Every structure is written in structure tokens, then in C-alpha cells.
Amino acid sequence: MPPRMTTQTQAVLLALLAKFDSDHYGLDLMKQTGLKSGTLYPALIRLEGHGLVRSFWEDIDPVKAGRPRRRLYRLTADGIAQAQQLTSSRVGGNAYA
């Protein structure tokens, strides 16, 4: 069963779909969607629980990079299909409305 498609969940899926072949980190997704962290991260966790998103830790040396590692997010094949279905079912308008 797919997750409930709230406006916020749709915004996250569509932001990930916009660059589906790239990895995204939380701050990037917050900027793209306008969602706050308290809304974004629970949505990502739900999407990952449903197999639509996968996440993993960035492979960097935090000391050399001068910053902590980021958790990266990417759509799975099922996530791409779900997001494309969502896009095709929308009738014009703003993707984040």
C-alpha cells in the first residue's frame, strides 16, 4: 500500500523526481519544497518505509571536507514510477500547491 499522498509528501516526491538521477540531502530538499525539517524528514522516513526512497550516508571524510557527513536521498524505481504517476495525474498548476 502506498503512503498517504499529502501535499507535503507530493512535494518531496516531485522534488526528488526533478533530478531523479541525483542524490539529495535534507537542506537541498527543504529549499526546493519550502518544507521545514519537522515536516520533511518524517515524510522521507515514510517514503523510505514504503520503498519509494532509499537513503544512505555520504561517503566523505568529515575532517577533510570540513563538515559532517550528509544523509542522502534518492528515489527507487518504485518511487520514480509513483512520482511520475502523480505528475501525470495532476491537472496543471503549481507542483507544490
Which positions does each model-derived feature cover?
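Short, charged/polar surface micro-motifs in flexible loops or helix N-caps
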Residues: K19-S22, H50, D78-A81
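N-terminal helix-turn-helix DNA-binding core of bacterial DNA-binding proteins
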Residues: P2-T39
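Exposed loop/turn and edge beta-strand positions of beta-sandwich/beta-sheet ligand-binding modules
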Residues: R69
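Beta-hairpin "wing" of winged helix-turn-helix
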Residues: H50-G66
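Amphipathic alpha-helical dimerization/coiled-coil segments
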Residues: D78-A97
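Surface loops and adjacent helix of pleckstrin homology
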Residues: I45, E58, Q85
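Basic amphipathic alpha-helical segments that dock to polyanions
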Residues: L40-L52
